[in-house]
């Protein structure tokens, strides 16, 4: 993971950071998403290291293949849907603190994700924010 990029995200609706220092993954604060799977509501914590698929579930089951409804843990709004993944699940977007969007598939276990920038300067800001290890 030495050459990986650290992703810091915020809610695209309320603008509050989604980083949770109380739940660590890959030795870094996790990305905290509220989720609803079936009738259960809980949290999914994702690694902030781009390309790491480490995650932790709290209050909901870690069931491979299930589609997760994802919400901001602060304002409760659902994250915007951008398109449908090849696996037929919705792709949601989280706002990067440096600018731009990270899009992730909402199906547990699907590894489809991407970084998108409207302004190329936001991409440069993200890369410049990384230290020499790439982990900030």
Feature locations, PLM:
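N-terminal alpha-helical interaction blocks
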Residues: 1-50, 134-135
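Short metal-coordination and nucleic-acid-contact micro-motifs, chiefly zinc-binding Cys/His arrays
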Residues: 4-7, 65-68, 78-83, 99-106
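Short cysteine-rich clusters marking metal-coordination/redox-active sites
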Residues: 11-14, 72-75, 85, 105-107
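Short functional micro-motifs and their immediate structural scaffolds
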Residues: 16-20, 77-80, 90-95, 110-115
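Short linker/helix segments within small regulatory modules
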Residues: 25-28, 62-66, 88-104
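Short metal-binding segments enriched for Cys and/or His
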Residues: 36-61, 101-126
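Short Cys/His-rich Zn2+-coordinating modules
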Residues: 49-59, 63-73, 86-92
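C-terminal engagement modules used by replication, chromatin/transcription, nuclear envelope/ESCRT
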Residues: 128-136
